[in-house]
Curated annotation (Swiss-Prot):
<dbReference type="InterPro" id="IPR031157">
    <property type="entry name" value="G_TR_CS"/>
</dbReference>
<keyword id="KW-0547">Nucleotide-binding</keyword>
<protein>
    <recommendedName>
        <fullName>Elongation factor 1-alpha</fullName>
        <ecNumber>3.6.5.3</ecNumber>
    </recommendedName>
</protein>
<feature type="binding site">
    <location>
        <position position="31"/>
    </location>
    <ligand>
        <name>Mg(2+)</name>
    </ligand>
</feature>
<dbReference type="Pfam" id="PF00009">
    <property type="entry name" value="GTP_EFTU"/>
</dbReference>
<feature type="region of interest" description="G3">
    <location>
        <begin position="101"/>
        <end position="104"/>
    </location>
</feature>
<feature type="binding site">
    <location>
        <begin position="101"/>
        <end position="105"/>
    </location>
    <ligand>
        <name>GTP</name>
    </ligand>
</feature>
<dbReference type="GO" id="GO:0003746">
    <property type="term" value="F:translation elongation factor activity"/>
</dbReference>
<dbReference type="GO" id="GO:0005525">
    <property type="term" value="F:GTP binding"/>
</dbReference>
<feature type="domain" description="tr-type G">
    <location>
        <begin position="15"/>
        <end position="236"/>
    </location>
</feature>
<dbReference type="Pfam" id="PF03144">
    <property type="entry name" value="GTP_EFTU_D2"/>
</dbReference>
<dbReference type="InterPro" id="IPR004161">
    <property type="entry name" value="EFTu-like_2"/>
</dbReference>
<feature type="region of interest" description="G1">
    <location>
        <begin position="24"/>
        <end position="31"/>
    </location>
</feature>
<dbReference type="InterPro" id="IPR009000">
    <property type="entry name" value="Transl_B-barrel_sf"/>
</dbReference>
<dbReference type="Pfam" id="PF22594">
    <property type="entry name" value="GTP-eEF1A_C"/>
</dbReference>
<dbReference type="GO" id="GO:0003924">
    <property type="term" value="F:GTPase activity"/>
</dbReference>
<dbReference type="InterPro" id="IPR029459">
    <property type="entry name" value="EFTU-type"/>
</dbReference>
Amino acid sequence: MPSIVLPPKPTALQKPHINLAVVGHVDNGKSTLVGRLLYETGYVDEKAFKEIEEMAKKMGKEDFAFAWILDRFKEERERGVTIEATHVGFETQKLFITIIDLPGHRDFVKNMIVGASQADAALFVISARPGEFETAIGPQGQGREHLFLIRTLGIQQLVVAVNKMDAVNYDQKRYEQVKAEVSKLLKLLGYDPSKIHFVPVSAIKGDNVRTKSPNTPWYQGPTLLEVLDTFQPPPRPTDKPLRMPIQDVFSITGAGTVVVGRVETGVLKVGDKVVIVPPAKVGDVRSIETHHMKLEQAQPGDNVGVNVRGINKEDVKRGDVLGKVDNIPTVAEEIVARIVVLWHPTAIGPGYAPVMHIHTATVPVQIVELVSKLDPRTGQAVEQKPQFIKQGDVAIVKIKPLKPVVAEKFSDFPPLGRFALRDMGRTIAAGQILEVKPAQVQIK
């Protein structure tokens, strides 16, 4: 049985690569739109999709067929049918676009902040249907939360898909109303709405996704795929020291220890002498693989499996970081960070102990000091040593990890310098590290 989502075609691997986050409130059509994009770009197995369509028809749920592409893919992944295909992707004329952390995941907010694949751009999906739209950008709406989040992450490239236009009879007035409301929110967050494309689409019917729709003669702009095609791939920092957070560790018979992760900065070559910290274990790189292809070297953005000689599986875990012996990743004794409080029922003071999610690591921490409270618009300090901070506040804080963890300054290594704080099953804050006080590391 072929996988429902096809692997990258040879043409795709020659194109510049972008990681796209698909964000928006539940039930606004994210999964359907992703399914539609994959289908329109030829990345869905026809035979497998026909089965899904027939099943949806039988159950009287024809509208679900495109969303079910992702459900089927997730099932395959959980059953281990497609181990390396944790991401799905599609091609535009100029780019190969990977969709990171498929929508609907319960840890989506956390994964957005510290996902192994950091987003270079975002597709914001908002429903035009009355009620759904108002909920999504209301005070408790995930749509609103996700927009705050992509702003906090510094994602500049954004497209807004105003979805479910078929449900409002392709009404231009409703589209303009949604556009005006979302623009207001974007402006508040410091985006320039005039530079952001809004596209009226129907994920179910396919309007304005790949081809211009006759149902929206009033819309003269580009299709969704045309907008995505204008996104710029970020510079990949090959000149920085090597940092590769570890997502997984395997012991493979006859090969030894294989660590899996994404190279965030620097270059990893076969034969390199590497160190994995916090455990401070040293080894040699025997081979590097991606998508079942052997590589001589891996660069930023590459998701790879690395066969390391001299390190045992028991010594390494998810959340450790691989670097080179001549530039060891920093294990943090204490960090100073700027945080945005996204959600908290009361207030946060010194002594508060949430869990920090940083790159692929999860570690208990304690906020030991509130240094200052900032004006969110200017970044200037408005209060020194506040007694507490609450939802919506931006502050500089000192944080002490209660277990060893690698953390770097955001300005040096962005993917290892941004984090989420979680508590009570929710994301409490998103932050960027300004200073790191390093712990002593003895190489073994």
